[in-house]
Amino acid sequence: MSDINTTRLPFVFVASPPCVGDDIAMVLTRGENLC
């Protein structure tokens, strides 16, 4: 899962930086952007 988290982490930040915050953990866990 390390590879998935590493790949997903930058993707989420680039996808929607203003939406990422306290929910980042949830977003990474679900693998979806919950904006």
Swiss-Prot record:
GO molecular function terms noted in the UniProt entry: toxin activity
Tree of life domain: Eukaryota
PTM comment: Processed by the macrocyclase-peptidase enzyme POPB to yield a toxic cyclic octapeptide. POPB first removes 10 residues from the N-terminus. Conformational trapping of the remaining peptide forces the enzyme to release this intermediate rather than proceed to macrocyclization. The enzyme rebinds the remaining peptide in a different conformation and catalyzes macrocyclization of the N-terminal 8 residues.
Cross-link Cyclopeptide (Phe-Pro), sequence positions: F11-P18
Propeptide residue span(s): 1-10, 19-35
Tissue expression notes: Expressed in basidiocarps.
Family: Belongs to the MSDIN fungal toxin family.
Listed name of the protein: MSDIN-like toxin proprotein 6
